[in-house]
């Protein structure tokens, strides 16, 4: 009982501790880092503006300047307000882009922190991980073949079923955003069309090589439920 409690606490710490540390790190440095970046990196931004979305917004501002030339007959106060508005929008655009870049850096940093924490768990907590593995194996072994077959069928339908495409798109979009990469629909579509197929092949091979050997009755129940 004591070993089970220790394993449960260890598993909870694996799940929540990396997230809590990375979240605290991000929130404690986010505001200071963004303010520093906005005050010291604006000139670098103006010399290195290549992103398509930012260019589109600057083109819109340029069109406003053309509109300014067309409105020369308007009162000077209106034209001055127009120039001031364009200037403010440009500054806001710089700050928004800088915040996006800083969030990308912070996301990448927190992911690196999580990786090192989990690596430390795997190296320093080898005995606890072995105990957790044995408890999970014991729990699965005590389940009936019907429940095992139902769980396998549910998991495969979620991962490689007909309606799993949208779920994979959301997962890959979230992962790319979390790592700070711009969402590319073509890359995501390519991964969605190939990754479930690879998983399906691996799963069928696993059934053929592993389940047929250790539990033929489970394979029979699975195929009957799948049909």
UniProtKB/Swiss-Prot annotation:
Family annotation (HAMAP family): CemA_PxcA
Give TM segment ranges.
5-25, 112-132, 143-163, 187-207
Q: What is its main location?
A: plastid
Q: Family per UniProt? A: Belongs to the CemA family.
Specify the protein name: Potassium/proton antiporter CemA
Where does the protein end up?
Plastid, Chloroplast inner membrane
GO molecular function terms here? antiporter activity; proton transmembrane transporter activity
Write down any Gene Ontology CC term. chloroplast inner membrane
Biological process (GO), any one = potassium ion transport
InterPro entries, per the entry: CemA
What this chain does, per the entry, is described as: Contributes to K(+)/H(+) antiport activity by supporting proton efflux to control proton extrusion and homeostasis in chloroplasts in a light-dependent manner to modulate photosynthesis. Prevents excessive induction of non-photochemical quenching (NPQ) under continuous-light conditions. Indirectly promotes efficient inorganic carbon uptake into chloroplasts.
One Pfam family recorded for the sequence: CemA
Keyword annotations: Antiport, Chloroplast, Hydrogen ion transport, Ion transport, Membrane, Plastid, Plastid inner membrane, Potassium, Potassium transport, Transmembrane, Transmembrane helix, Transport
Catalytic reaction(s) noted: K(+)(in) + H(+)(out) = K(+)(out) + H(+)(in)
Q: How does it sit in the membrane?
A: Multi-pass membrane protein
């Amino acid at each position: 009982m004591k070993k089970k409690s220790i394993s449960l606490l260890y598993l909870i710490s694996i799940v929540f501790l990396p997230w809590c540390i990375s979240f605290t790190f991000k929130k404690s440095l986010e505001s200071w880092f963004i303010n520093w970046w906005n005050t010291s990196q604006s000139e670098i931004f103006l010399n290195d503006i290549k992103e398509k979305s930012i260019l589109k917004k600057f083109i819109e501002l340029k069109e406003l300047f053309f509109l300014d030339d067309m409105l020369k007959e308007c009162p000077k106060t209106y034209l001055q307000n127009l120039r001031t508005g364009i200037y403010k929008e440009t500054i806001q655009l710089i700050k928004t882009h800088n915040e996006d870049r800083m969030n990308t850096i912070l996301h990448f940093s927190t992911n690196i922190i999580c990786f090192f924490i989990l690596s430390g768990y795997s190296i320093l907590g080898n005995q606890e991980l072995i105990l957790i593995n044995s408890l999970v194996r014991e729990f699965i072994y005590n389940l009936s073949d019907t429940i095992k077959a139902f769980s396998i069928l549910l998991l495969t339908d979620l991962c490689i079923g007909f309606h799993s495409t949208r779920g994979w798109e959301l997962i890959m979009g979230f992962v790319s955003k979390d790592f700070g990469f711009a969402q590319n629909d073509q890359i995501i579509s390519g991964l969605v069309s190939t990754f479930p197929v690879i998983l399906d092949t691996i799963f069928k091979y696993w059934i053929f090589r592993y389940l047929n050997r250790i539990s033929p009755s489970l394979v029979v129940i699975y195929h009957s439920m799948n049909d």
